[in-house]
Amino acid sequence: MANSQKVIDVSNAHYNLNLELGSVYAQYAHIADDQFSMPFLAKFINDLSNDKLGVHKDLISEYARKIEIPLHTKFSVDVSFKPTDPKELVKHILETEQKVRKHVANMAKVCLEEGDFETFSFVKWFVDDGIKDFDDVRTIHDFFENGNNNLQVEYAIRQIFKANEAWGRKII
């Protein structure tokens, strides 16, 4: 099946969104570590960055090759957001991940409208992964909402990493 231009466009938009967010999240990881002295929060955000720049990018790139659609890299990064504390940073990331969910929903909608069920099936992976990523970020956000201080939050994040490592799982 030949892909419609709309499907090609949303696929490229998603590819570029992942490149952009991966780069932005890498910067946020540095902020979490350098400005807020929260290395486990930084690791969490860096893992989110690596997920976007690694797994997501690779899946889209491989799928584009498989179905022979062109990918066009068109993104620029200007990290103008300057959080005053880690709670504000995580809230911003949560809001960003909510926008990603809407973007993926639109991608799925376009695929269905265009009758491209193969690409829709591919997009379902991003729906599932987006649910997991959003829930992980929301968990960290909730730690800040319910914790008394950043040290408690940092400890809770560390405990999540330790528990997941014991089970051989990754957070992101």
Curated annotation (Swiss-Prot):
Gene3D superfamilies: 1.20.1260.10. It comes from the Bacteria. The keyword Iron applies. GO terms for molecular function: ferric iron binding. Residues 1-148 form the Ferritin-like diiron domain. Keywords: Iron. Pfam families: Ferritin. InterPro entries: Ferritin-like, Ferritin-like_diiron, Ferritin-like_SF, Ferritin_DPS_dom. This is Uncharacterized protein UU427 homolog. It comes from Ureaplasma urealyticum (Ureaplasma urealyticum biotype 2). The lineage of its organism: Bacteria, Bacillati, Mycoplasmatota, Mycoplasmoidales, Mycoplasmoidaceae.
